[in-house]
Amino acid sequence: MSEALQDKTIVVIGGSTGIGFAVAKKAVEAGGKVVIGARDPARLEQAAITLGERSTALEVDTSDIQSLATFFRTIGAFDHLFVPAATYTVVGLDSDDIEAIESPFRSKFWGQYWAVKQAVPHLDKAGSITLMAGAASARPIKGGAVYAACNSAIEGLGRGLAIDLAPIRVNTISPGTIDGHLWRNRPQEIREMAYEHYRQNSLVGRPGTESEIADTVLYLMGNKFVTGSNLYPDGGYALR
């Protein structure tokens, strides 16, 4: 499978930082060409410099359908899609903040849905789509019912799209807590509480890494016999 991405074009929306950047980096190392998309031009520029000449950076906003349409028209034909980009807030039933309550679905679910819809006309029939859900689908946290439902919905979307879009392959990943860009930009006290919880409640006794999640995504891109599947790179968290 080491040559599966050789000279393939991989599109990563949310590719300037975090898991998305880790996927883009490994795709380049595997011989692929990557197009990274994000909203922040400065981060995009820096990521493209790091990735080198086999990368292209384009601005895109998954909350804007026209932005997505322009993004994919500019790219043209490509082979694989991964969309980890999302900005949301996790609140409980006691919250009256409608924007925060709906944000997981608006950003994480609908952002990926509309990205896929705009991408499909340009995506090779032998290619793949990998959606990003989360282990909260299998193991909800207190105060995170909507977030858990959103991740479950994304897993269901992946199975449904695998049927609708065949022979294009569609799979989903549901990672657990990852020691990476997202958590490192949160307050240290909250971050350490989350990491300690994960150390105590996962089978491997630690949070994951962005590199480990990227390996999972590249596996799904490269294995031509896997579709309609959901993988839990969560260190066994969902089993405890």
Residue ranges of model-derived segments:
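Conserved glycine-rich Rossmann-like NAD(P)H-binding loop of the short-chain dehydrogenase/reductase
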Residues: A30-Q46
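Conserved Rossmann-fold SDR core element
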Residues: E155, D164-G180, V226-P233
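Catalytic Tyr-x(3-8)-Lys segment
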Residues: R191-S211
